[in-house]
Amino acid sequence: MYKALFSRKTIDKIPEYYDCVHDLLNTSAVQELGEYTHHKGTTRLQHSLNVSYYNFLLCRKLHFDACSAARAGLLHDLFLYDRKQHEPVEGEGNHAVGHPKVAFFNAAEMFPINDREGDMIANHMWPLSPHMPHFRAVSYTHLTLPTILLV
């Protein structure tokens, strides 16, 4: 079973988190993220698990929608291609700006996501991307830099 970086427990041993994401976790689309390198030394699946788990913990502490944050964290990089070999589609812009839209469309097509989850996925690169999130959420896209977005 999977474990978030620095967590002492596997995620199946953390029922309040696991209950939020178990339906997504064993799908072929989420599993496929394990085939892509995210940054040096980690896969996109491990990165997404880290974002998901720590987003969940931080949102729970702040009394935000922790389940939606966990689900959005797991799906926020759901683009199924190698970003280093990907040719941007016209109008998509560079990868940093364009991939949230691709991840959102993939997530919305493959899974039942709510408005908050969709918003967090589509706008997780703000302020690099042009659209500001519509909901109060926590974006934990870098393990060392939680950014609280109060919208």
Positions of predicted regions on the chain:
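Conserved small/polar residues in nucleotide/adenosyl-binding loops
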Residues: 141-147
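An active-site-proximal "capping" alpha-helix that borders the catalytic cofactor pocket
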Residues: 52-54, 98-108
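Metalloprotease/metallohydrolase-associated module, dominated by Zn2+-dependent proteases
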Residues: 107, 112-136
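Acidic/His-rich, divalent-metal-binding segments that scaffold phosphate/diphosphate chemistry
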Residues: 1-86, 90-92
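Short amphipathic alpha-helical segments at helix boundaries and their inter-helical linkers
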Residues: 78-88, 125-140
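Alpha-helical scaffolds flanking conserved acidic
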Residues: 64-75, 116-120, 134-140
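Histidine-centered active-site/metal-ligand motif
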Residues: 47, 76, 95, 99-100, ...
